[in-house]
A protein has these predicted regions:
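Non-catalytic connector elements of ABC transporters
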Residues: 1-69
């Protein structure tokens, strides 16, 4: 898969949790760092996302959400 986005973090899916319409996918990128993405349940199904799959988190600056730790 080729993308123009430069902020790509490779890892393994640690967890997939589906809600009513939107799900959360956690990607373990190593060193104890987990990236969580909110995507539609339809996207989870179409991509056949499962725990243990190799995955990549693609981050666009316009889509980054900041939370307080």
């Amino acid at each position: 898969m080729k993308l123009s986005a430069r902020n790509q973090l490779k890892g393994k899916i640690a967890r997939v949790e589906k809600g009513r319409t939107t799900g959360h996918v956690q990607i373990d990128i190593g060193k104890g760092i987990i990236i969580t993405a909110s995507i539609t349940n339809e996207a989870i199904d179409e991509l056949k996302l499962k725990k243990g799959n190799d995955a990549v988190a693609v981050i666009k600056a316009s889509d980054v959400i900041v939370g307080k730790l």
